[in-house]
Amino acid sequence: MKKITRLFDIPYYQKEKFNTAEAFVTKYNGKWVSTSSQEYIIKAIQVSKALMALGIQKNDKIAIISTNNRTEWNIMDIGILQTGAQSVPMYPTISEEDYAYILNHSEAVFCFVSDAEIFNKLQRVRNQIPSLKEIYCF
């Protein structure tokens, strides 16, 4: 890699320069789990391929909502950007009405969330968001 010109170039640069076994570390059920630079890239590519299989097009908007700092958020973000789509990061603590407003304004077609609580909040306003095709939990 010669130069970073896009956000999704960063994981590839990181792997080439540092190739760390602990690019990300997240606590799951009280245990710390590491994700290497290579795993990060592989998982982001898998996300990109899955989104393309779902029909994502360049400039589509995809929302991401997480209640805490998680490896999956970063993987989703890079996976989204690699497809040419745009990430719409959202705070987990906003109201259902704010979710509906932001998702409508951004015209998000998919939303990825970290847990059932956020999923349920979105489900309660889903009928107000015509562009939203699906909500997924990571």
Residue ranges and their predicted role:
Residues 23-78, 95-100:
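Conserved AMP-binding/adenylate-forming core of the ANL superfamily
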Residues 82-138:
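Structural core segment of the AMP-binding/adenylate-forming
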Residues 10, 65, 118-122:
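A general structural detector for well-ordered alpha-helical segments in enzyme core domains, enriched
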Residues 2-23, 42:
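A short N-terminal helical cap/helix-turn-helix that marks the beginning
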Residues 19-21, 59, 132:
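A general structural motif
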Residues 8, 27-28, 38, 125, ...:
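Domain-wide signal for the mature, well-folded portions of proteins, strongly enriched
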